Amino acid sequence: MAEKTANDLKLSEIELVDFRIYGMQEGVPYEGIYGINVAKVQEIIPMPTLFEYPTNLDYIIGVFDLRSIIIPLIDLAKWIGIIPDKSKENEKIVIITEFNNVKMGFLVHSARRIRRISWKDVEPASFSASNSINKENITGTTRIENDKTLLILDLESILDDLKLNEDAKNAKDTHKERFEGEVLFLDDSKTARKTLKNHLSKLGFSITEAVDGEDGLNKLEMLFKKYGDDLRKHLKFIISDVEMPKMDGYHFLFKLQKDPRFAYIPVIFNSSICDNYSAERAKEMGAVAYLVKFDAEKFTEEISKILDKNA
């Protein structure tokens, strides 16, 4: 699905698979509208035959065999914190995804269409105190037709629950004396920021965080006010996610390269999207590396190469 639409995608736009989950709130049924990046979706299948999967995570309801690959199935309604509409019990499909080099299946009620949306129309999520949805699992929102809201999910946090980021958290600090200076990193996922901050801190860097491209540009201005023309001596590189509300990583890099104060700064893309097109696009735009979250050893190797080159 990603390959079919990738060549048409413009800078600062995202294509989302629009899918629905039917829930109940105070006894009243409602339709939840959600989106996931097309680049992360491999296929959509009917409900498969499930096998038991021993886990204490109640939203993992089993595993299934897809062409000899065993894939865990996540009940998205449970994960988000939705009380399901039982009248829709038989209306279920599975969205097969791959991100962070991990395949997973997500149980939803229906997939409607593919939407092309500008990142500037995606806002960070905010909810009323009474809302029952687990707010930590929502990374952004955007308005669609009839003044409805589509929610973009932070699916990366599931990997943390599954302990698939443990290698990053437990990575040994073998270069602390060599690695020093400032690093700016951008990511809208709280889970990804936590993992990255932990690793960079172990490597000896001082860290400035940003939650999207706009915030990243603002943080750069703050660093320039702090260091002036000496910023070059202090800020070693920038690490940026690709998918972010308000301003995505590609547009952030484009803006960066237009500003002579910052155009020299090496930029590493650190993304959950693991397709060749995204990596090639990043290199064409001038990124020094495109990494798939999160391989701690490879990440450290890339940092070492950049610092050696700029020494």
Curated annotation (Swiss-Prot):
Domain of life assignment: Bacteria
Keywords per UniProt: Phosphoprotein
Phosphoprotein keyword on record: yes
Keyword Phosphoprotein attributed: yes
Gene Ontology terms: biological process: chemotaxis; phosphorelay signal transduction system
4-aspartylphosphate modifications at: 241
Organism of provenance: Helicobacter pylori (strain ATCC 700392 / 26695) (Campylobacter pylori)
Record's function text: Plays a role in chemotaxis signal transduction system in order to colonize the host stomach. May act as a phosphate sink to control the flow of phosphate to CheAY.
Domain called CheW-like: residue spans: 13-164
SMART domains, sorted: CheW, REC
Disruption phenotype: Deletion mutant is fully chemotactic and forms swarms the same way as wild-type strain. Mutant appears however to change direction frequently and shows defects in mouse colonization.
Protein name: Chemotaxis protein CheV3
Response regulatory domain boundaries: 182-308
PANTHER family in alphabetical order: CHEMOTAXIS PROTEIN CHEV
